[in-house]
From Swiss-Prot:
Keyword Coiled coil recorded: yes
Domain notes per entry: The LRR repeats probably act as specificity determinant of pathogen recognition.
Location of the RPW8 domain: 1-149
Swiss-Prot/TrEMBL keywords: ATP-binding, Coiled coil, Hypersensitive response, Leucine-rich repeat, Nucleotide-binding, Plant defense, Repeat
Species for this entry: Arabidopsis thaliana (Mouse-ear cress)
CDD domains in alphabetical order: MLKL_NTD
NB-ARC domain boundaries: 247-414
Gene: ADR1
InterPro entries: Apaf_helical, LRR_dom_sf, NB-ARC, P-loop_NTPase, Powdery_mildew-R_dom, WH-like_DNA-bd_sf
Coiled coil region boundaries: 96-112
Protein's recorded name: Disease resistance protein ADR1
Length: 787
């Protein structure tokens, strides 16, 4: 038998592919078979070439088997030549088509058996050699480390800490991979299971799995679809991923798919690739769907004990039977075990007894998984302070799968529940400790000066569903929270049916598309204090019934579309005398004039990704008369903001944040008018070239952030007059030096800067000994693209 390289020297696969392409284009009766053969041979061709050019010496057995494969391909080549020699309408085409079918079966059998055996054999061969090399390397490294006395080091790996839970995850991965490797011709696979069962965790682990990434040559895309998908964004991501110029098998993982319609729409964009759909429903063929298994009793016991006792089993004096009863009632659901375990942490046995009794009154185990989860979750909430519980329920007003700005969340709670910001912050920590929300990691979270800028929280879908479920138990007109669970083109029909009677809701949340005058119907909301308007469009007519919401204290208008929306109907603001907080995102801000209705109680304004145009340029009137009580102004990612002249006429300002505004060149000289200003953030304003000397006349200023102001090269000479200044953040600035007056900053306690600037501050530290100089690590992120 000739060697493998000799057999394939003529590259028979390339010749055969050309002939098959001609057959597919010219002989109708053989078209389908030829196309299938083309696919099969193209898939195996890279492997053949890899072996051919690797220089490896194959065993006699492997050469014999590959010789058989060569003979099959040679038969196929000769058959193609016969087919092409026949006239177009020759009856022999039928005979040739049957012959091609036989060859197709032979090739398929060979690829499904022999090739896999060869790979396994070579892997075993390499593994033996690799193990020997690894042992030799270990010995050499040990000898080297001993001679140099290297200190012991530790690497932290983000993984599941409990081996039993990790085993469950590995089992799920194994079963999904078995499906993928078995049904190679299938384009749709599924992971299905009840809420909180670990579907997403399993999907994420699969996306990182070496075997999966090897199968798809690292071409794996993970997308979260959600109940109200943004198809424009999702389809854009899919297009960029699939049409990257690389023609190979690819995997798209669609997580949190709610409906068949959503899947069908996205699948129409993923033709020719493999899709793994992750859903509460079974959307793929049962043969290619993995149903996530709930935890077994010992695994569930381990997870609950880790959350409640920080160990894998109950402590010896504790009543193990009580723990077992709680585990039994959780029915193996990981999310339920985790939340309930956290709620029971550090609680005495008597408290556990009460929880067990309440759990036993719940519904017995059955197919209705969501209701069981809600029942367990609600038991976990019973131990919360009533106001914290209400704050948890308020989170149902925000869209699913979206990061919630902490500043927005606390503003809602402050105005809704008459608490201060410090208390609202403690509520966030309390809910986070109970695993009822997640604080998105931010290294500066909790800093007393920074406040809540750039800090977000998220909430699991099941927990949000629980909040909606609990809020909707009473009649629609009696609900304290009137919430739309997902985006709809119009308001709910249930609301329209009951519009003749006033609604008692104090929080109203609407999720719609573009709305005009005809889309709204009248609603009487005399008790409403918070209104959240989420929409996606370029034009949006504000609901006329806002004008009757005389108690409204918080108004949030968020456009989730691609470009800023034009709002219509601003005349309704004339009746919002009690409005205290206004949050606008991705909209055109109306121009302020001397005729603008004053908002005398407005304390907070947030403008995010807005077009502000001339809103803050006018000097012909006193802007402080429109906002006489404004204490907190945030302008972020507003790329058309040019001047701030009128802003510094607002003498009541306590906090001013101008961030990511690329066209701001300078601050106005009337800056010193804002005598009560304590926090000044000018983060990432790359064209800002200087700070006016008037900034030194602010007696209450405690915090200054000029980080990423790359054009700023100096501080005012009299900067040392800021006797109340406690903290400066100046990372990624281009300062050439510090004024000598900074030695007089007796209250300064914290400076964040780059390595190059730190030496300047070391000189200041000699006269301000309590000064802490923090050298910042450079951090590049595009998280803001998610907003």
């Amino acid at each position: 038998m000739a060697s493998f390289i000799d057999l394939f020297a003529g590259d028979i696969t390339t010749q055969l592919l050309k002939l098959l392409a001609l057959v597919a284009n010219t002989v109708y009766s053989c078209k389908g078979i030829a196309e299938r053969l083309i696919t099969m041979i193209r898939d195996v061709q890279p492997t053949i070439r890899e072996i051919q050019y690797s220089g490896a010496e194959l065993s006699n057995h492997h050469q014999t088997q590959l010789g058989v494969f060569y003979e099959i391909l040679e038969k196929a080549r000769k058959l193609c030549e016969k087919v092409l020699r026949c006239n177009r309408w020759n009856l022999k085409h039928v005979y040739h088509a049957n012959k091609m079918k036989d060859l197709e079966k032979q090739i398929s059998r060979f690829l499904n058996s022999q090739i896999l055996l060869f790979v396994l054999a070579e892997v075993c061969h390499l593994r033996v050699n690799g193990d020997r090399i690894e042992r030799n390397m270990d010995r050499l490294l040990t000898e080297r480390n001993d001679s140099l006395s290297f200190p012991e080091t530790m690497m932290e790996i983000e993984t599941v800490s409990d081996p039993e839970i990790q085993t469950v995850l590995e089992l799920g991965k194994k079963k999904v991979k078995e499906m993928m490797f078995k049904f190679t011709d299938t384009h749709l696979f599924g992971i299905s299971g009840m809420s909180g069962s670990g579907k997403t965790t399993l999907a994420i682990e699969l996306s990182k799995d070496d075997d999966v990434r090897g199968l798809f040559k690292n071409k794996v895309l993970f997308l979260t679809v959600s109940r109200s998908p943004n198809f424009e964004n999702l389809e854009s991501c899919i297009r960029e991923f699939l049409y990257d110029g690389v023609h190979q098998r690819k995997l798209v993982i669609l997580d949190d798919v709610w409906t068949r319609e959503s899947l069908d729409r996205l699948m129409s964009k993923i033709r020719g690739s493999t899709t793994l759909v992750v859903s509460r429903s079974k959307l793929a063929d049962p043969r290619t769907t993995y149903n996530v298994e709930l935890l077994k009793k010992d695994e569930a016991m381990s997870l609950l004990c880790l959350c409640a006792f920080e160990q894998k089993s109950p402590p010896s004096p504790f009543n193990k039977y009580l723990v077992k009863q709680v585990v039994d009632e959780c029915k193996g659901l990981p999310l339920s075990l985790k939340v309930l375990g956290a709620s029971l942490k550090n609680k005495p046995e008597r408290y556990w007894e009460g929880v067990v009794k309440r759990l036993l009154r719940g519904e017995a185990a059955d197919e209705t998984h969501e209701s069981r989860v809600f029942a367990h979750m609600e038991e976990s909430l019973e131990n919360l302070d009533p106001k914290i519980r209400d704050c948890f329920l308020d989170m149902g007003a925000f869209p699913e799968d979206k990061k919630i700005p902490l500043d927005l969340l606390t503003s809602v709670w402050v105005e809704r529940h008459d608490i201060d910001e410090e208390t609202a912050f403690s509520f966030v920590l309390r809910l986070a400790d109970k695993n009822l929300l997640t604080i998105v990691n931010n290294p500066r979270f909790g800093d007393v000066h920074i406040g809540y800028y750039d800090v977000f929280v998220t909430q699991h879908d099941v927990l949000r569903d629980l909040a909606l479920h609990m809020s909707n138990r009473v009649d629609v007109n009696r609900r304290e929270r009137l919430l739309m669970p997902k985006t709809e083109p119009v308001l709910p029909r249930e609301w329209e049916k009951n519009k003749d009677e006033p609604f008692d809701a104090k929080i109203v949340s609407l999720h719609t598309g573009e709305m005009d005058e005809m889309n709204w119907f009248d609603m009487d909301l005399p008790k409403a204090e918070v209104l959240i308007l989420n929409f996606s469009s370029d034009n949006y007519v504000l609901p006329p019934f806002i004008g009757k919401m005389s108690r409204l204290r918080v108004l949030v208008i968020i456009n989730n579309g691609m470009s800023p929306a034009r709002l219509h109907g601003f005349s309704i603001f004339a009746n919002l005398a009690k409005l205290r907080s206004l949050w606008l995102k991705r909209v055109h801000v109306p121009e302020l004039t001397s005729c603008t209705i004053p908002l005398k109680n407005l304390h907070k304004i947030h403008l995010i990704f807005c077009k502000v145009k001339n809103s803050f340029v006018q000097t012909s009137f006193d802007i402080s008369k429109i906002f006489p009580s404004l204490s907190d102004l945030t302008i972020d990612h507003c790329d058309d903001l040019l001047e701030l002249k009128s802003i510094f006429g607002i003498t009541s300002l306590n906090s001013l944040s101008i961030t990511n505004c690329p066209r701001i060149l300078e601050l106005p000289k009337n800056l010193s008018n804002v005598q009560s200003l304590e926090r000044l953030r000018l983060y990432a304003c790359p064209e800002l070239i200087s700070l006016p000397v008037e900034v030194c006349e602010l007696p209450c200023l405690k915090y200054v952030d000029i980080s990423q102001c790359v054009s700023l090269v100096s501080l005012p000479e009299k900067f040392g007059k800021l006797g109340s200044l406690e903290k400066i953040d100046m990372r990624e600035c281009s300062l050439l030096g510090l004024p000598s007056s900074v030695a007089a900053l007796v209250s300064l306690r914290h400076v964040i800067c780059d390595e190059e600037t730190s030496s300047m501050w070391e000189m200041v530290k000699k006269v301000v000994p309590e000064l802490c100089i923090e050298v910042a690590k450079k951090c590049f992120t595009v998280d803001w693209l998610d907003d």
